[in-house]
């Protein structure tokens, strides 16, 4: 997540539950999947040594690179290489004026994120979360303006829970439980979405999405010009879940009609 994250609705409105803001439109894909909990990992879900290899200096992967939609493997090797990766990620984050960064954003498809809401090296608290899983989130929803290092120049309101509780591991492999609220919870959820292949425009309401559409098209055009590749249209995990749910409901309805 980029450092510019304004409470754009103002302190009074931003602190209100979503239900008290009549002007906020429904989310594009619904909020039921806003926080995705990762299923238990099978052996093949774990990253290999090759998956964790990287060459410094790391660079931020920009939308619409398919790396941002790829599957991210869990980590079960906690060594000097992992610590070096987290150090490099913090360096990239600070140099690009970010406050959070996920591993896939630097081209490493594993379940790892770093963040520091202060956004300045030597200030605030540096947090490293490996293999995070959300087990509880608040019902209170807030709207804040977000930006993303993978989407330069794009800023938009996104609705998220005010606080979350997390199971994760630290960089040594020790299991930890974390409760985050406010800005820290917001940054975590943004980065956690990246680990599920979810991008922040997947969370935008239709009217907000429309306001950034031209910016997205510009990034798509730059990607095609720089790579010579046409943009790969990959269905968002959030949208895919919605589509599958619709088909399941249709199938269930059809089955009931046959039975009765």
Explain the meaning of each model-derived region:
Residues 2-189, 194-260:
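Active-site rim/adjacent substrate-binding subdomains
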């Amino acid at each position: 997540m980029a450092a510019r994250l304004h409470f754009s609705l103002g302190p009074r409105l931003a602190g209100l539950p979503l239900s008290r803001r009549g002007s906020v439109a429904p989310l594009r894909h619904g909020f039921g999947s806003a926080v995705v909990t990762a299923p238990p990992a099978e052996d093949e879900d774990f990253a290999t040594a090759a998956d964790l290899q990287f060459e410094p200096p790391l660079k931020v992967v920009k939308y619409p690179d398919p790396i941002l939609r790829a599957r991210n493997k869990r980590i079960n090797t906690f060594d000097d290489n992992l610590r070096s990766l987290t150090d490099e990620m913090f360096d990239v984050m600070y140099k690009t004026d970010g406050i959070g960064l996920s591993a896939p954003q630097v081209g490493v498809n594993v379940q790892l994120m770093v963040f520091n809401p202060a956004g300045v090296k030597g200030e605030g608290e540096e947090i490293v979360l490996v293999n995070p899983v959300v087990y509880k989130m608040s019902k209170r929803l807030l709207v804040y303006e977000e930006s993303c290092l993978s989407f330069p120049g794009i800023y938009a309101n996104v609705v998220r829970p005010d606080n979350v509780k997390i199971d994760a591991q630290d960089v040594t492999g020790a299991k930890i439980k974390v409760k985050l609220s406010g800005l820290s919870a917001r940054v975590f959820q943004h980065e956690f979405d990246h680990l599920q292949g979810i991008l922040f425009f997947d969370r935008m309401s239709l009217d907000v999405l429309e306001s950034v559409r031209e910016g997205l098209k510009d990034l798509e055009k730059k990607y095609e010009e720089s790579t010579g590749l046409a943009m790969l249209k990959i269905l968002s995990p959030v949208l895919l879940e919605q589509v599958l749910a619709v088909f399941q409901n249709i199938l269930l309805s059809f089955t009931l009609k046959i039975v009765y």
